[in-house]
Amino acid sequence: MARIAGVDIPNDKRVVVSLTYVYGIGLPTSKKILAAAGVSEDVRVKDLTPDQEDAIRREVDAIKVEGDLRREVNLNIKRLMEIGSYRGIRHRRGLPVRGQNTKNNARTRKGKAVAIAGKKK
């Protein structure tokens, strides 16, 4: 397994798909990285030469991925909560942030339904 940005990427898959195992790299970004590195999308990871691996690593190092990206996202959310914006309040309360309806759904964000005690007579 090749190791890129601290992530073991699978040997048997095509490089364009294997790069998506790194947090922050999707298919479009993966294609751009390979084009900039001059590597074909169809080649398998196990067939990469050491020079090609180094070229891919250099391109990935130029992008914010993995821990740095996670840290930036968490800091952005924390900043929203500190300034008291609407989005920050929704994050703090554990409710949907992007305007979704919460009357019936939003169970993933709100957690398991809790019965109201003393509702029955």
From Swiss-Prot:
UniProt-listed InterPro entries: Rbsml_uS13_C (IPR027437), Ribosomal_uS13 (IPR001892), Ribosomal_uS13-like_H2TH (IPR010979), Ribosomal_uS13_bac-type (IPR019980), Ribosomal_uS13_CS (IPR018269)
UniProt biased composition (Basic residues): 106-121
GO biological process: translation
Region entry Disordered, spans: 96-121
A Pfam family annotated for this UniProt entry: Ribosomal_S13
Molecular functions (GO terms): rRNA binding; structural constituent of ribosome; tRNA binding
SUPFAM superfamilies: S13-like H2TH domain
PROSITE patterns found in the cross-reference section: RIBOSOMAL_S13_1, RIBOSOMAL_S13_2
GO CC terms in record: cytosol; small ribosomal subunit
Keywords: Ribonucleoprotein, Ribosomal protein, RNA-binding, rRNA-binding, tRNA-binding
Role of this protein: Located at the top of the head of the 30S subunit, it contacts several helices of the 16S rRNA. In the 70S ribosome it contacts the 23S rRNA (bridge B1a) and protein L5 of the 50S subunit (bridge B1b), connecting the 2 subunits; these bridges are implicated in subunit movement. Contacts the tRNAs in the A and P-sites.
Record-linked NCBIfam families: uS13_bact
Protein family per UniProt: Belongs to the universal ribosomal protein uS13 family.
Quaternary structure note: Part of the 30S ribosomal subunit. Forms a loose heterodimer with protein S19. Forms two bridges to the 50S subunit in the 70S ribosome.
Name the record gives this protein: Small ribosomal subunit protein uS13
Organism: Streptococcus gordonii (strain Challis / ATCC 35105 / BCRC 15272 / CH1 / DL1 / V288)
Gene it is expressed from: rpsM
